[in-house]
Amino acid sequence: MISTKDITGLILAGGRAQRMGGIDKGLIPFHGKPLIESAIAKLKPQVQTIVINANRSITKYATYGYAVIMDETPDFSGPLAGFSVGLKTCKTPYLLTSPCDSPLLPNNLAELLAAEMERGDFQLVYASSKEVDGKVWAQPVFCLMRSNLQDSLNQFLQKGDLKIDRWFKELRSSTVIFDDPQVFANVNTPEELKKLEEVSA
């Protein structure tokens, strides 16, 4: 059985945040505190330890007491670049990933993804959300993966491909559908930030 001590949490804070005017999203105030603090609070009970993937504000992120790792690829290459360095530093059998700007992520994210992982002996399990209209949307940056996937990911990245769903298709992967799409809401615009603060007040 996969337990908390088997999982390292990786918070992805390495993006450009172009739609937010280039502001470092993890440090944007949310209810008066940097967004990343909500991500840390949600992940901490679900994992053994946390690692933060960031490409700027390194000193600030380091004040939270966790290791801060930078992408090894240039020009803000996306979540797979963060996955890659996360796997490289992971010392537990599993890595759980989440972006820094989704403050409402499920308290049982690790538990449900781990149960599916064990059910089908998968290499990676990602979250999906059921929207109000009944459609199911993949939420691939919320995923639990085996920490021995670094070679697979490196080979994929060496082909010049950065599409997260295409890498998933090369693996034994599955998904868990969450009924509340709000738990994966993230911040891409000031309007979305305001809306998230309202629904989580």
PLM region spans:
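Hydrophobic helical membrane-anchoring modules
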Residues: 199-201
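Nucleotide and nucleotide-moiety/phosphate-recognizing core
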Residues: 2-161, 166-185, 190-192
